[in-house]
């Protein structure tokens, strides 16, 4: 009874626009209340609805019609809402799944990017470390080489200073000694200092002798070259004179009185030219 009463109340609350059946034309109904003058058994008259005239339904039929249409409409609306709710839930689940997938994908991309950055950073740090180590090794090698060169230069300077001091301590009279005498003094020396001293004297003597010989040789070569140049110049002059005489001999055909003198002059020039060539 309660369910029927609630359905009736729901049917009474539904407006007339919601009671339209699908596929049926909407009609305007007007309920006629019984006239008080005629009593309860009076029937409703026909009234005008819009521009058309339709018979008026009795007011006793309206509650049942409202109840049936309301229940059918509500059931259909409930099914539509359920279907829409199901679709929305499916769409929401799909969107939630897509959201979680995108979130997981984004997290994986972030982790991959972090791993890539970490790997690159480690490789860069390792490269910088190796470069720094190679640079340090190169600097140490250069320092060691510089120290070695410095030590060698210092040793060479000390050796040169010692040799200079030994040469300064040499007696000038010892320069007049022969090489054999110096060698004898080295053989007869008792100490290493004496040997070094006599050896320095021998080396100095050899250097001086070599320099003197080179100087003498250069002077002699210069004199020889000068003599050669002078002889060549004289040969050229004599040769030119011989050519001139030949030309004069050929051109002076009219002068035949003294051929013997000209021939003698030519022989003299040839003789002088031969002598100059021999020299």
Curated annotation (Swiss-Prot):
GO cellular component terms, semicolon-separated: nucleus
Keyword Isomerase: no
Tree of life domain: Eukaryota
Biased composition (Basic and acidic residues): 1-11
Biased composition (Polar residues): 248-263
Species of origin: Mus musculus
Coiled coil segments of this chain: 65-169, 218-255
Keywords from the named record: Coiled coil
Keyword Transmembrane helix: no
Protein name: Mirror-image polydactyly gene 1 protein homolog
InterPro entries cross-referenced by the UniProt entry: MIPOL1 (IPR026175)
Disordered: annotated segments: 1-21, 247-268
